């Protein structure tokens, strides 16, 4: 009887204290980026480059693309809010990539260079979100199905430092 209770207790401990294992499905997109975030400073009329590193943590080769968005901070939390290009957002045109699309194998790191060609009329700050996602998203196989489409973003703050520019902040109320 004691042997039975020990066995039962051991089984109980094993079943309830063992951590669950989550399997990654073959179709899962698992990307890791570095560095986060990136802060660049350059003078108008020059170019500046930075390396973007991405790792495929998935189980299969992934063909990826880089798209450009912009970001701002949510008012209450300060977390980034990604936004699409709007009319007048010409700073999107300043960015080029060494490889806008590429393939990365499982567990492999890939480095892509982003170059910002800053025009002479640029000034102050520009907020980019460089988004890595699948080049061709998988579409649902059957009718009335939905799919979650996503990626991961590297946030880039580009400061165009104008030598004669004057920065001034006024506190209206405290």
Place the predicted regions along the sequence by residue.
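Long, low-complexity ectodomains and other extracytoplasmic segments of secretory-pathway proteins
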Residues: 23-51, 57-60, 137-174
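Intrinsically disordered, low-complexity regions enriched in polar/acidic and amide residues
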Residues: 2, 21-23
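Terminal connector regions
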Residues: 60-83, 117-163
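Surface-exposed loops/turns
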Residues: 43-44, 106, 122-124
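Short, hydrophobic beta-strand segments
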Residues: 53, 112-120
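Bacterial N-terminal signal peptides
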Residues: 8-18
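Bacterial N-terminal signal peptides that target proteins for export
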Residues: 1-9
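Surface-exposed binding patches on compact interaction domains or structured appendages
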Residues: 25-35, 59-114
């Amino acid at each position: 009887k004691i042997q039975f209770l020990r066995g039962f207790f051991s089984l109980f401990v094993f079943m309830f204290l063992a951590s669950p294992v989550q399997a990654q499905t073959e179709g899962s997109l698992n990307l890791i980026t570095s560095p986060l975030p990136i802060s660049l400073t350059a003078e108008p009329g020059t170019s500046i480059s930075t390396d973007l590193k991405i790792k495929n943590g998935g189980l299969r080769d992934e063909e990826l693309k880089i798209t450009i968005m912009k970001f701002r901070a949510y008012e209450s939390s300060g977390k980034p809010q990604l936004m699409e290009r709007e009319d007048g957002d010409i700073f999107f045109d300043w960015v080029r990539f060494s490889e806008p699309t590429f393939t990365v194998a499982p567990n492999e790191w890939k480095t892509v260079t982003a170059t910002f060609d800053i025009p002479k009329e640029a000034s102050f700050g520009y907020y980019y979100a460089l988004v890595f996602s699948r080049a061709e998203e998988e579409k649902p196989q059957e009718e009335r199905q939905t799919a979650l489409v996503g990626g991961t973003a590297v946030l880039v703050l580009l400061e165009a430092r104008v030598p004669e520019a004057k920065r001034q902040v006024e506190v209206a109320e405290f």
